[in-house]
């Protein structure tokens, strides 16, 4: 598909995939230390013209320069963890005249605004990460969309005739 996208005029190729890797390194370590998982064989089959892969599924946070694993595939591989606890800032600099990608960088930022409690207990602020003051304008914007989506989000889409458990199967999924 990449040749068709390039032929149609695409200058930058970004792949979104709901599959991820396991990462034993820091959330911003581009070396890809300890990266493993079922996404790797998929990545190794991607066209070398891919510039960025935004991944997920494993709920882990990472920014990986995939050229450290496979020099023939010099794209960035990113994931922002889970539940909005991390946001990935991605910067793709493209020459406006030629359309050539000049540089690509990504950085994961831990998002925390205030301590809270949930069913699992207290969730305190972590002093080693910056805390962001909640913005009323963004809360209002999110509230508008939450309200607009409420009917669809609460719509019954099926029923379950038996018990649903959170017991983990052989693959670790529940």
Residue ranges and their predicted role:
Residues 30-61:
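Structural recognition of alpha->loop->beta junctions
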Residues 1-33, 41, 69-174:
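Acidic/His-rich catalytic or pseudo-catalytic neighborhoods
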Residues 17, 45, 59-64, 92:
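Mobile, glycine-rich extracellular loop/lid and propeptide segments
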């Amino acid at each position: 598909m990449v040749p068709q996208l390039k032929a149609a005029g695409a200058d930058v190729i970004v792949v979104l995939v709901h599959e991820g890797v396991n990462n034993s390194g820091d959330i911003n370590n581009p070396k890809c230390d300890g990266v493993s998982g079922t996404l790797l064989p998929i990545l190794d089959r991607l066209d070398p013209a891919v510039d960025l892969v935004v991944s997920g599924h494993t709920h882990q946070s990472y920014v990986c320069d995939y050229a450290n694993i496979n020099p023939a595939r010099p794209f960035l591989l990113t994931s922002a963890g889970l539940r909005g606890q991390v946001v990935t800032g991605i910067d793709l600099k493209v020459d406006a005249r030629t359309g050539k990608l000049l540089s690509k960088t990504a950085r994961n930022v831990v998002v925390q605004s205030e301590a809270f409690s949930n069913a699992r207990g207290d969730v305190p602020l972590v002093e080693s990460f910056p805390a962001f003051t909640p913005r009323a304008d963004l809360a209002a914007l999110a509230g508008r969309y939450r309200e607009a989506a409420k009917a669809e989000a609460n719509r019954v889409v099926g029923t379950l005739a038996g018990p649903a458990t959170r017991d983990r199967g052989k693959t670790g999924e529940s």
